[in-house]
Amino acid sequence: MSNITHPAVSEQLLVRIAAGDKAALAELYAQAKNPIYCFALSILRDSFAAEDVMQETFLQVWKSAPTYRPSGKNALTWILGITKYTALARLREGQRAGIPLEDAADKVDPRDAFRDCENRIVTQTILAQLAQDEREIVVLHVVTGLKHREIAELLEMLLPTILSKYRRSLKKLERLVREPS
């Protein structure tokens, strides 16, 4: 995770995508692929499934961009909403089919450099020890750069709940990192 924070996604990009501008979709992909992938991974805990959900999210953004209503907020929140519902649908499909989703900590992208892989494994292993909602909140804030109020809106939780869970998660992560292996 070399790029920790991500700029707000411009609503203008979605307007251009709605008009069929493929260059705008490519620009959106460059800006949003990491936050989308990381959020999907925090839900699915399977790197291959997260990759699929990321691709499905971009297809859905392409199809749904004409229905997007600019609100003056970070458009990434809307896109991550699509990611959330796509990932949850994938989880339900897997459960109905009886297919176990493997831990993301067991998956390593072979294209990454060794150090990058090592960092991913450590990060995923530590994050896997958080509860699902805690992991989502941490990833959405730290990795995607969403503000707490945007996370509250996306996850349909109260802002004080998000803040409390975020602080508690950070304390839990700090304890996990300090514990001898």
Task: List PLM regions with ranges.
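Internal acidic/polar
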Residues: 6-10, 89, 96-120
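Short, charged helix-capping/linker segments at alpha-helix termini
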Residues: 2-4, 18-27, 37-56, 180-181
